[in-house]
């Protein structure tokens, strides 16, 4: 249990911080929230259309990193519960503090079924995690609670285990060096059994998942409101086809952008975690733009000032440049 709950999750959090510089279709349809005006324009040409580039960065990396944290947390708890059974287990973290998990088997079936609940809590839990040859001291506090809404299949083979579950972050925070982040809010995640086309289907939705970050003294926030992610993972190629929709709002020192996301062509994502194909569009109440990804790492932004249906500017950038914008 310690391995899955503590080491796996801490490593995932550390990777997120390092990147910052320091089943059924049970997910449900979450309607987009009423879109609010943004304080900055996507179509502002200043600094090479920096606002549009930043919006593209937050659209993909903000969605990916937030979903990954919730998903890894949920999967870790499911694996831990299937291995250890009901009850509470606490462990001491290597650098001090504690990590604990509680699994409540409501029907006494000694398996994961609808109605079961779980929670995990970190109290100043410190671990040294080695990433890219460097040792990163990561401190976790707060926790998450989980509710299994539906489940079927044996947990002994998680590939054949389908579920719908809600994960709620309760001031779950991580700090490493000069970077910190805090998660709050709920995300519902569903997983299918293998489909006839040899894929696993994942759906994630959220109305209020929030991430507050402080990266080298620069603060920002991300809010998923009426947001949805659809992911088809190929069991043959182990690549994902990801579609994003709904609302993603973010605030940086430059202002806020409230984006409505649509995916015209699913994003092709491999082991690197970055798209090598596909296109996603993002719009404010005034402007809209799209980002098309290539296998070379190049990204083309097409900007439509005033949402007239005409491309008014085309910007060339790279996925690494967008990742840097998101991390800083």
What is the role of each PLM region?
Residues 1-8:
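Bacterial N-terminal signal peptides that target proteins for export
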Residues 21-25:
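Bacterial signal peptide processing site
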Residues 15-19:
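C-terminal motif of bacterial Sec signal peptides marking the signal peptidase cleavage site
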């Amino acid at each position: 249990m310690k391995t899955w709950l503590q080491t796996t999750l801490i490593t995932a959090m550390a990777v997120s911080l390092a990147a910052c510089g320091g089943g059924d279709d049970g997910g449900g349809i979450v309607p987009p929230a009423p879109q609010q005006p943004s304080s900055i324009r996507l179509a502002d040409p200043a600094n090479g259309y920096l606002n549009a580039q930043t919006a593209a960065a937050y659209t993909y990396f903000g969605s990916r990193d937030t979903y990954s944290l919730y998903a890894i947390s949920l999967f870790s708890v499911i694996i831990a519960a299937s291995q250890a059974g009901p009850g509470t287990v606490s462990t001491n973290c290597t650098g001090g503090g504690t990590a604990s998990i509680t699994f409540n088997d409501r029907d006494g079936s000694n398996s994961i079924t609808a109605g079961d609940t779980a929670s995990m809590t970190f109290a100043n839990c410190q671990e040294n995690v080695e990433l890219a040859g460097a040792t990163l001291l990561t401190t976790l506090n707060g926790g998450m609670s989980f509710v299994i809404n539906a489940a079927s299949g044996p947990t002994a083979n998680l590939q054949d285990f389908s579920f719908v579950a809600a994960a709620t972050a309760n001031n779950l925070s991580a700090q490493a060096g000069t970077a910190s982040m805090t998660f709050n809010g709920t995300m519902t995640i569903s997983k299918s059994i293998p489909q006839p086309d040899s894929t696993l289907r994942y759906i994630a939705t959220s109305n209020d998942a929030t991430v507050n970050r402080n990266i080298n003294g620069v603060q920002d926030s991300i809010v998923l409101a009426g947001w949805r992610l659809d992911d088809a993972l190929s069991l043959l190629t182990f690549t994902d086809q990801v579609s994003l929709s709904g609302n993603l709002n973010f605030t940086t020192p430059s202002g806020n952008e409230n984006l409505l996301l649509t995916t015209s062509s699913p994003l092709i994502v491999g082991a690197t975690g970055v798209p090598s194909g596909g296109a996603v569009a993002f719009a404010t109440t005034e402007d809209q733009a799209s980002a098309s990804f290539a296998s070379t790492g190049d990204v083309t932004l097409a900007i439509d000032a005033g949402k007239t249906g005409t491309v008014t500017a085309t910007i060339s950038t790279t996925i690494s440049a967008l990742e840097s914008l998101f991390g800083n």
